[in-house]
């Protein structure tokens, strides 16, 4: 997802 830091999944809503 754009603008989302690497390792962060916006779909999960939490850090991966």
UniProtKB/Swiss-Prot annotation:
Domain of life: Eukaryota
Any one GO biological process: proteolysis
EC number: 3.4.22.-
Hydrolase in keyword set: yes
Keyword Protease annotated: yes
UniProt keyword terms in alphabetical order: Hydrolase, Protease, Thiol protease
GO function term, MF aspect, one: cysteine-type peptidase activity
Purpose of the protein: Involved in the dissociation of the larval fat body on metamorphosis.
Similarity section: Belongs to the peptidase C1 family.
Protein name: 29 kDa hemocyte proteinase
High-level lineage: Eukaryota, Metazoa, Ecdysozoa, Arthropoda, Hexapoda
